[in-house]
Structures are given as C-alpha cells and as structure tokens.
Amino acid sequence: MTSMPLRFSTLVMVLAALTGLPIASWGQGAQPNAAVSIRGAGSTLAAPLWKKWIEEYAVGHRGVSITYDAVGSGEGVKRFIARDVDFAASDEILTESEAAKLPEAAVMLPVTAGMIALAYNIPGVNSEIRLPRDVYVDIFAGAIKRWDDPRIKAANPGLAFPHRDIALVARQDSSGTTAAFTKHLAAIGGGWRNAGMRVGKLIDWPKG
C-alpha cells in the first residue's frame, strides 16, 4: 500500500458544553472531591491526538475519567446535539441547522489540523506514481475506471499499468474528512460537479 499526500489540510473543531464539566475548578495537582466522567465522540482523524491527550491528562488526575469514541464527525455532532456526550470533534464546520440545535452553553474551538492522503495498491506497480489533480478528480468521480487509462499512463512514463478496474475505497459514514476531501475535489475544476457529484459528509461514491 502506497500513499500520496494531497496539498491541503483540514481543520478539526471541538464542540464542548461549558455546563456539567467541573474540571476547571481545581488547581494543578489537586483532585476533584468526586469522580468526574467526561464523554466525547466524533472525528476519526483526530482520534490519535485525543487518545494521547486523555492518557497524559489521566496521569495527574486520577479522579477524572475521559472517554472518546471515534465514530466520525457527523455521528459525533449528532450525539453532542442529543446531549449524549460532553464534547464532540468534527473536521467540518457545523451547518446552520446543526448550530441552531446546540446547547446555549456550547462553544466551538479549533484544536488541530490534519493532512489527507490518497492510498493506492496497484498489482505489479511497486514505484510511486503521479496522479495530477484533474486525474484523481475523475477517478473519484467515476470517469476514469482502469489503471491503464491513457491519462494515468501519460503522467507516469516508463511504468506499466495493468488493465484492471480501479476499486474505490471510501468512507460510508457521515465523515468530516469526506466533506473536506469532496470540497477539495470540487475546487479543482468543473469535473467533479459536471459528473453529478456533490460535496458533503456522506455521499454516494461511484460503483466500480
């Protein structure tokens, strides 16, 4: 499996309810008078960072239990709106309808940014390949269907590509990463929109 980083990043936002989280009321090294449980959910992109933060915070705060479910940005926001979690992380900014449903005490803050990469596995091709922007747009839009397509071969002279179908692997849940990626595809040119594809957290990818 080889990956090709894309030259754009996505910002991860965190939603938090300021009520019901009494963790800021004691000083460094002090412990809360009662056990505190904090639940979060959302972005899979940010999950490794949350895991690290939670582990580091737990070292000096034995009375605080923090959990984070990496269920995707859309599901995380849904759980936060339903008051099922205390905070949620999303790679995509909230829609107006989602923002209207937030608790009054909710705040939204940027916490990190991440890169998105394309991963590919081509039998018989062990070298890194080049995929121009308009080419990978048409791959994900379903206009380029095989690895030996003339446009892929033209971008990679000297490489022998097999006459095999390109099998797309993409998120099937409500994902902020999908929203960021499809925004990128739509911004490159008209190919994405012209193919009838849309931008969003959950889309219908072309069937191979």
Q: Whereabouts are the PLM-identified features?
A:
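N-terminal secretory signal peptides that target proteins for export/translocation
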Residues: M1-L6
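Bacterial N-terminal signal peptides
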Residues: S9-P22
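Flexible loop/hinge segments at secondary-structure junctions
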Residues: W26-G208
